[in-house]
Structures are given as C-alpha cells and as structure tokens.
Amino acid sequence: MGSNAKGRTVMEVGTDGVAIITIINPPVNSLSFDVLFSLRDSYEQALRRDDVKAIVVTGAKGKFSGGFDITAFGVLQGGKGEQPNVRNISIEMITDIFEAARKPAVAAIDGLALGGGLEVAMACHARISTPTAQLGLPELQLGIIPGFGGTQRLPRLVGLSKALEMMLTSKPIKGQEAHSLGLVDAIVPPEELINTARRWALEILERRRPWVHSLHRTDKLESLAEARKIFNLARAQAKKQYPNLKHTIACIDAVETGVVSGPRAGLWKEAEEFQGLLHSDTCKSLIHIFFAQRSTTKVPGVTDLGLVPRQIKKVAIVGGGLMGSGIATALILSNYHVVLKEVNDKFLQAGIDRVRANLQSRVKKGNMTNEKFEKSISLLKGVLNYESFKDVDMVIEAVIENVSLKQQIFSDLEKYCPPHCMLATNTSTIDLELIGERIKSRDRIIGAHFFSPAHIMPLLEIVRTKHTAAQVIVDLLDVGKNIKKTPVVVGNCTGFAVNRMFFPYSQAAILLAEHGVDPYQIDRAISKFGMPMGPFRLCDLVGFGVAAATASQFVQAFPERTYKSMLIPLMQEDKNAGESTRKGFYVYDKNRKAGPNPELKKYIEKARNSSGVSVDPKLTKLPEKDIVEMIFFPVVNEACRVLAEGIAVKAADLDIAGVMGMGFPSYRGGLMFWADSLGSNYIYSRLEEWSKQYGGFFKPCGYLAERAVQGATLSAPGGHAKPRM
C-alpha cells in the first residue's frame, strides 16, 4: 500500500495454520477505503495460501473497529472522480469473499465493534467477545442506514424486534448481552481472546463447531405473519417519534425486503437505500454535527499553545439549588470530590437530598448500580463555611442571579481558595467583568454555564473574559470532557452565545401573536419543524419570572432591537406564571398535561392595545413555512451578530450550542448550517421586508447584509472580529 494510505491490515500466520488479520487505523481502527481494500487483500492471500487453514479477524490495541471512516463520506458525497460503490463492498467483498470463504473465519472482538466493524464481524463464521466490548449499528445517527449487510445479518442473529431496536435507537450493547442474544458465540477475558478465537476457528474447520453463514440463518426470524406485525409497529413508532426523518423508514424497508424476498434481495435493497440517503440533506446535516461537536475543543490562541490541563481533584460548589445540585451530581458521577456549600442547615440538606435523588433516579432506571451510588454519594461533602475551600482546585458559584451577592462570594473565594484555584460562575446572563470587579486575580475568573438539568443536558458553555488565562480555559475544557459534556468556548456578553442567539425566539412569537397569529398555531409549526416544544410552551416551562427577568436583561443591553410587549406582565398580574402555577399560555391538569388557556385571547388583546399594534390580516392565515422563518430568521440574525463580535470562535460552535442548549433539530445541521441551506440573500431579503412592515426587531445586521451582497455563506470564515478574551 502507498505511504499515504489511511490505515491498513497486517496478517500473521501461526504454526497452527491460523492467519491473524489485524485492522490498524488509530484511534478506533475505522474502516477507511484503504483498510477495507487491505482487508480484502489479506483475506484473498489467506485463502490462496496452502499453509493457512483458518482466519481470525481482530483490531489493534484492544479495539476491533469503530466502524466506517466518516471522513470518507465526503468522497462518497462529492460526486467527483471514481468512487467506491457501497454495493460492491457489501456484496462483492463482505458477502462473496468474506462470508463465502472456503476457510472458516472468527471475529475476535474487544473494545468496539460498531457500524461497519460489527458488519464485518457478522460476516465471519463465529464471534468471540470480551464482556465489556461495545457492539452496535449506530449509522442512523448520521442519517443513513447500515450499508455493509447489517440490516440483513443482525435480524438473523438476534431476531427482528431486538435488531430493529438496536438500529433505530443506535444504542450499542455490551459483549455480555450480545452473548445472551446470540450475536456473539462466547465471552472471554481480553488476555484469552486471540487464543480462544484461534481454537474456535480450527474447531469449525474440524466440524466440531458449526460453520454458520449469518446471512442464511432463519432460526431467529419470526413467522411472516408475526414479522409483518413487528414491521407495522416499528413503522408507526418511527413515524410518531421521528416524523421528519426518512432514513428510519428506509431501514425498516431494507430489513423487511430481506425477510420477505430473501437475504440477497435485502442486500440490494440496503445498498440502494444507503446510496440514496447518502446524498440527503439529513445525512449532510448530521455528519456536519458529528464533526462540529468534535471541533468545539479547538480554540485558536488557547488550545494550540501546548498547554497541558492541570489535574482537578476537588471542586467546591457554592449554592445547592437545582443548578448547584445538578452540577454536583455531574461531578461526582465522574469521580470528582465535591464540597457543596450552603448558607444554613435546611438549604444544605435540601441540596444534598437533590443530589441523592438525582442518583437514585439513575439506579431506578437501571443506569447505575447500588455500589456505584454509594461510591458517588461518598464523594460529596456538605459545608456551611469556607474552611474546606483551602485545598480546592476549582469553585463553581451557582447562586441566584444577583450581582451584589455574586460579587461578595467572589471576594470571599479570593480570600479562602488557593492561588491556583479556578473561580467559575454558572451565571446565564450577568457580565463576568461585573461579577469579578472586586477581586485582583481576574485571570482566574471563567464562566461555566451549565443548562438545566445540569447532570443531564450535554452542553457546557465556557465563557472567557479579556482577562481569563488560557490555562484556565484549557483546564475547564478538560473538566467538561471528563464529565461527558460538550464544551463550547464563547466570549463575554449579555446572554453569552445560546441565550443571546435565542433571545429573539420568544420575542418573535409574541410579536406574531400580537399581530394576529394564533399562538397555538405557532407552537405547532415550531414543534413540527423539530424543536422539542414551541416558544409559548417553553415560556411556560421555564416560568414567567425567569422569562421576564431574562427579557429585561436584553431590553437593557439591546434596546434598539427588542420587541417590547406587555403580554407576560399582564398575565403575571393575574397570577399566571407558567407551568408551576398550572396556568400560563396553556392551562395544566394535575398530570401536567397542557391544554389551551381560554383567557389568552383577552390578554393578547390588552397587550396589542398597549403596544399600539393592530391585527394584520395577512398574518392570520400565515403558512407554517412563514411562521418558522419569522421565528427563526431573527435568531439567525442575532447569531450573525454573535459571530461578527467575536463572541463565538466559529459558526459550527453556534450550531452545536443551538442543538445541545436549545434543542434545535440536529438533523437540520444546527442553526447556521440550516440558514446556509436557505441562503444569506434569501434570509436578508425576508428580514428587510419584515422590518419595513413590523419595525426594527427584524432589521438585518451588517454581517448578514454583507454576506448577502457577496453571495457568501454565513458560516464561511473571515470578517469575524477578534475573539473576545
């Protein structure tokens, strides 16, 4: 193979006549085209050689294979030059060479056998695994389906229901469960894996063990009548759960074709569906998200300086409310020692009880053992003073949004914490410069903005000021990785990146409602677009108090472009506060089920009079497409300002922030990726048109106008301000 080859396989033949073929492509032994063609060459060589009796396929350094090399999707989607055909790999290579081999092959699985890796393993005649190895077909997370025979072989090894569940949820299973299902034939410790696989392969050759072709097994398949029921149920669930996604149905169709028309027909159907989905917007969007998520930790001028993260062993949290207890939960789950400080015994006990409840919820769901529960809770210590802060490596302040209180806490922290200690705040809106203005060591101050519930939501917004040391950012990035959060580094401003971008979201909804659009129609359109809930339902969930406080921050910071409405204050006067009072834009029954609030029209009419606006007949019958655009284009506009001001490093970071912080649909690629699919000129012209009709709220910013004139994408680099430090 050439020196530029991306990965390879090596083959060693033992004195027992077993050829060990090892996949080598760090870090996860992904199946690049180079690896696949090298694997084929190794197989063909083993089949030709008279001294080779049997084959074992494995992966280097304790990982079988993490699956098809995702960077190769660009080659397949590009449409330039000669491209490898997935059908050729699935049928001509994996089926007709590997599975049809006249010498038995055994897969020796450790670490990972995911996607294409598991598909190669299933084409072997037996599989031996370690107990903790992860096996699965997660391709649907990328908007495609398994393309190397997975839709045909998995159902024949584990049964239809389990196979569909594994593919549609993309969740891997451990080796032990795989053995109980029949996906693997034996479980052994890592040190015995290769020798066991060698013996197994020879025993197949000697007919002491079955020589199984997975593709032709039928003993695990249900009867045709039962299979049809399973397919119908799976389709109904997929349409309900993923109404905007076609690839879930395509996966079910491929499996069904194999069951009804035979495995060869199923392989052809799988290849046909894979090829079509590969060029879909959904696939391109999800692959963008995949790479964008992995690039958030690359911060120019910070992570390229060669700094090594310092070891953080002990973390203190000030405030044991919902956020503080959630952050404490996330930390102790990752084996950090945590000191939780409160102002009195009552609040402290309540905070500890919340952490305990968070952990017990995991035990109840089967996600945590009682042993792990005891170990985790033992890492938590509750205190009422700062005495235990003298040896902490990091403090996270998580008290209410009160500037003077936070300033006092940071003054105390500077006195009691060691000089190396990071001083972090979980504020969601307050200027960090203001919080730290009373202390001397401002290079240690950083924002660690978690999203509620903090132990579940995947995003960590890391906020840097112009004083924050690069070492402190590197340290917090490392903590974020350790607690399994996706960190996004942003600059310091009102609302930072996520809340700043999305502050027009609810404002646009209220503006439309006051101009005659039915609020429930707005929520339906936005939910249908793919958001977890519409803006009015979201406002009820967070509560009117929080919504009003956040709105006032933005009115203060950006008075020229906020839509000032009395709708929420008027509703608050009559004790409507959202879901917590069972009455807001919706009314809630005792089971928290939402229904329309019959009094809402009255409040909208009052707010309309207060704002001096009237119903626009054009808006009363606004199509769903226009509702989506009038809600989200102002959000895109604000995101452009965030980029122009250097608050975000790159547009892809905003895509991840929107997906993980606000639930923007990942299958649309994130806010900026979606906006670029529509075009900067289109978004600019629509906003310009609306600004003439409905005021400055819709006025497109300079960055957007410039991109529209140039015909450039919003996410293209260049024209950004220097990142705010």
From Swiss-Prot:
EC number: 4.2.1.17, 5.1.2.3, 5.3.3.8, 1.1.1.35
Principal subcellular localisation of the protein: other
Catalytic reactions on record: a (3S)-3-hydroxyacyl-CoA = a (2E)-enoyl-CoA + H2O; a 4-saturated-(3S)-3-hydroxyacyl-CoA = a (3E)-enoyl-CoA + H2O; a (3Z)-enoyl-CoA = a 4-saturated (2E)-enoyl-CoA; a (3E)-enoyl-CoA = a 4-saturated (2E)-enoyl-CoA
Subcellular location: Glyoxysome
Keywords associated with the record: Fatty acid metabolism, Glyoxysome, Isomerase, Lipid metabolism, Lyase, Multifunctional enzyme, NAD, Oxidoreductase, Peroxisome
Pathway of action: Lipid metabolism; fatty acid beta-oxidation
One Gene Ontology term from the biological process aspect of the record: fatty acid beta-oxidation
GO CC term (a single one): glyoxysome
One Pfam family cited in the UniProt record for this chain: 3HCDH_N
Highest taxon listed in the record's lineage: Eukaryota
MF-aspect GO terms: 3-hydroxyacyl-CoA dehydratase activity; 3-hydroxyacyl-CoA dehydrogenase activity; 3-hydroxybutyryl-CoA epimerase activity; delta(3)-delta(2)-enoyl-CoA isomerase activity; enoyl-CoA hydratase activity; NAD+ binding
Claim: Ion transport is one of the keywords in the record: no
Similarity remark: In the N-terminal section; belongs to the enoyl-CoA hydratase/isomerase family.
Comment text on domains: The epimerase and isomerase activities are contained in the N-terminal region while the dehydrogenase activity is in the C-terminal region.
Classification via PANTHER family: 3-HYDROXYACYL-COA DEHYROGENASE, PEROXISOMAL FATTY ACID BETA-OXIDATION MULTIFUNCTIONAL PROTEIN MFP2
The protein's name in its UniProt record: Glyoxysomal fatty acid beta-oxidation multifunctional protein MFP-a
Lineage: Eukaryota, Viridiplantae, Streptophyta, Embryophyta, Tracheophyta
